[in-house]
Amino acid sequence: MKTALVFAAVVAFVAARFPDHKDYKQLADKQFLAKQRDVLRLFHRVHQHNILNDQVEVGIPMTSKQTSATTVPPSGEAVHGVLQEGHARPRGEPFSVNYEKHREQAIMLYDLLYFANDYDTFYKTACWARDRVNEGMFMYSFSIAVFHRDDMQGVMLPPPYEVYPYLFVDHDVIHMAQKYWMKNAGSGEHHSHVIPVNFTLRTQDHLLAYFTSDVNLNAFNTYYRYYYPSWYNTTLYGHNIDRRGEQFYYTYKQIYARYFLERLSNDLPDVYPFYYSKPVKSAYNPNLRYHNGEEMPVRPSNMYVTNFDLYYIADIKNYEKRVEDAIDFGYAFDEHMKPHSLYHDVHGMEYLADMIEGNMDSPNFYFYGSIYHMYHSMIGHIVDPYHKMGLAPSLEHPETVLRDPVFYQLWKRVDHLFQKYKNRLPRYTHDELAFEGVKVENVDVGKLYTYFEQYDMSLDMAVYVNNVDQISNVDVQLAVRLNHKPFTYNIEVSSDKAQDVYVAVFLGPKYDYLGREYDLNDRRHYFVEMDRFPYHVGAGKTVIERNSHDSNIIAPERDSYRTFYKKVQEAYEGKSQYYVDKGHNYCGYPENLLIPKGKKGGQAYTFYVIVTPYVKQDEHDFEPYNYKAFSYCGVGSERKYPDNKPLGYPFDRKIYSNDFYTPNMYFKDVIIFHKKYDEVGVQGH
């Protein structure tokens, strides 16, 4: 009883120091609800002309006076003129931000929206652009503007896979949904149909289609690129992004590691990195069609890269060599030839990652280029090197890039540069890794089960209607999606005093695909972060109980557009209440993919926990709106990353076993089983 009272007191103290994100839900007022409703309606059937007459009237051709109500450089009127006078990408054509002309126009539109002086100007500009610029460009620029404008904080976007399903759902599924809708056109009724997804096993890569084609995974990457577009100039827009480059590295490093664990569960070896001299063996048919009916390019197997209209292969190799030279010399040079140390400057990792991504914070974009994006363009256009077809391939859309197996081979090459840099950093000493007075006594993990399930998805937006009276609800059940049974784990910590600590949880492989046990230094590259959170431990023993739902890397399942709009509309009409959740993050990793697929007889993994000192970085550290999903998505602008250690610590540097194992960490062998849905006994599904 005494122990229970002490534990309750500790829990109460923790709640006071690190408030639960539920405390940050605020009741939305009518002004906010109007904004939220406006945004949802602007995304309604964006691939066709607006059928909502009030927005059409608001969006009539804007006057010079209206376009001057913006602080966009050089002037709103000039930018508006470029977009309005037929110079922009026309509607009905595919859009890709990786194409320079498309990107320039998208930035112009973003500037018009972002620099609008007030919400009224912002909304009118959006209504104007909704029917007058390319629909893909509108979705892209408008989404990013909603994320970054101060007066839109808390406003949420509808799921991208519902707004524009053509980049998320196989075209045969969309075609069948359109056929079903035609049979019931204009009825206004709800129709749900089960449409099986064809994961035909033509190659090894098809074994992983349940993972790479998961709409939540691809929505996660879409939102990440909306938060941190490579063209985003932090100086111009006045937003500081803490650890921007390092976050880019870590996010894609984690995605790759997660992909690797799925390969293990399917008895597949690791992939080889891309080599210029070897053919690209992985064929890929995206099975996607743009809304205008054009098919996304198909890549045959065993093709060699060639020069293309944007770059010569020699140019890309030169940029790559310059980055390697910077790693070897230890310095990167900016546009004024000022050297920046990669090893003796606290921002060294930032300089390198910004150079490799080629974002606008790069020390010298014109000298170091953007080899990450160049790789994608080089292989993406391997079947159309001179853009004769004019269609963007899967590697040049944030919505589709993770579906293509070559992405992971390209990342393997990119990661080689990062590891070359990391391997020159000094290893962590025993004293650096240890936490004096703190020991993880035990970790107890509940049973881990994965399963495949059918899940509902609305394809309302994939059908064309003439007016609001023709709108019918079209739902499909897509099979299959990987999911897991919720699980708990307990971490038993002893401490010589009461103090704030930081807990990080990882999951990694134990054996390779042939059943050989991994050396820790080899498998450190494949540990995926499961959770990261602050905690207050008392003197003596503390048991930390954690549920998989609590994970700070995940985003909850998104409401469908239809459900979301209904909630907002009813609250606007005073029929219900709507709360703005500051702890919600668009960009979080999908909850259904938190753990990799198991096997019927079980797949062995290693559960790893490390407890480190909590070092305060900012006065708002770990307020829920500041840290939810920050490990994969960063903390946004004008916020400090709530940890002083490198991302991925302590697996980010070489490991020497004799010094690595310390009392404040714990390795636990776990088994993940894969069962049929009806064998798992999941509640609430």
Swiss-Prot record:
Gene3D superfamilies: Di-copper center containing domain from catechol oxidase, Hemocyanin, C-terminal domain, Hemocyanin, N-terminal domain. Larval storage protein (LSP) which may serve as a store of amino acids for synthesis of adult proteins. PANTHER family: FAT-BODY PROTEIN 1-RELATED (PTHR11511:SF5), LARVAL STORAGE PROTEIN/PHENOLOXIDASE (PTHR11511). One of its GO terms (cellular component) is extracellular region. The keyword Secreted applies. Belongs to the hemocyanin family. It comes from Periplaneta americana (American cockroach). It holds the Pfam family Hemocyanin_M. It is found in: Secreted, Extracellular space. One of its GO terms (molecular function) is nutrient reservoir activity. Residues 1-16 form the signal peptide. Keywords: Allergen, Glycoprotein, Secreted, Signal, Storage protein. Glycans are attached at residue 233. This is Allergen Cr-PI. SUPFAM superfamilies: Di-copper centre-containing domain (SSF48056), E set domains (SSF81296), Hemocyanin, N-terminal domain (SSF48050). InterPro entries: Di-copper_centre_dom_sf, Hemocyanin/hexamerin, Hemocyanin/hexamerin_mid_dom, Hemocyanin_C, Hemocyanin_C_sf, Hemocyanin_N, Hemocyanin_N_sf, Ig_E-set.
